[in-house]
Amino acid sequence: MLLHIPGLFDADELARIREALERADWADGKVTAGYQSAKAKHNLQLPEGHALAKEIGTALIDRLWKTPRFMSAALPHKVFPPLINCYRDGGNFGFHIDNALRQPKGSPERVRTDLSSTLFLSDPESYDGGELVIQDTYGVQQIKLAAGDMVLYPGTSLHKVNPVTRGQRYAAFFWTQSLVRDDSQRALLFEMDNAIQQLTADVPDHPSLLQLTGTYHNLLRRWAEV
């Protein structure tokens, strides 16, 4: 399941973020890649724990926790702190699958990467290339969103970032460990939750709503890991 979550940051916020990123000291993106992924990764990244990355990441996670669409789709349990990257001068990341487990720097806790997320920080007109290409059950999806928009997709997906041939592409990315690890089960719960919300708006007093809501929670109880 791929999910587009728009408008997490406004234009003024994004302009300030990009201005700060232009002044930042960047490191080789291979630092946080696994052995196989490092062979395909050609980009820049703010070092893990960088103050600016923490500031952007904290604001992003705080907003997502207040975004019902994200909460319903991801059912988040743990989140790996967001990282910030930059693609320019032909920078790219070849096809790869993200590592199954991630351990935040300085933390003993590990995060299972059930879901991957990319928040676009650059206006799409400001750079050429840089599409996030995801292979899923419906074929190949090419994603290049407006600045401030985010895409959520299964961590099991084979994906790449096309070379950036003009300008620079800033983005935040992170992983979520869901309460429900199976993507098909999460998708079913998301569809049920959407149906419940729509029925609540259309026929709020319908007696079947109580039964449907109960079924949702019973399925969540069966599948959730806490």
UniProtKB/Swiss-Prot annotation:
How many cofactors are bound and how?
Binds 1 Fe(2+) ion per subunit.
> Which EC class is this protein assigned?
oxidoreductase
Any Pfam family matching the protein: PKHD_C
Note the superkingdom of the native organism: Bacteria
- Cofactors: Fe(2+); L-ascorbate
Its EC number(s): 1.14.11.-
Statement: the UniProt record of this protein carries the keyword Iron: yes
Q: Which GO terms describe its molecular function?
A: 2-oxoglutarate-dependent dioxygenase activity; iron ion binding; L-ascorbic acid binding
UniProt-listed Gene3D superfamilies:
q2cbj1_9rhob like domain, Rabenosyn, Rab binding domain
Q: What stretches pass through the bilayer?
A: none
Q: Where does this protein hold 2-oxoglutarate?
A: 169
**Is Methyltransferase set as a keyword in this record?**
no
A Gene Ontology biological process in which this protein takes part is: intracellular iron ion homeostasis
Keyword terms of this UniProt record: Dioxygenase, Iron, Metal-binding, Oxidoreductase, Vitamin C
Outline the extent of the Fe2OG dioxygenase domain. Answer: 78-178
- Residue positions binding Fe cation: 96, 98, 159
Q: PANTHER family from the entry?
A: PKHD-TYPE HYDROXYLASE YBIX
Instruction: Name the HAMAP family for this protein.
Output: Hydroxyl_YbiX
Name used for this protein in its record? PKHD-type hydroxylase PP_0862
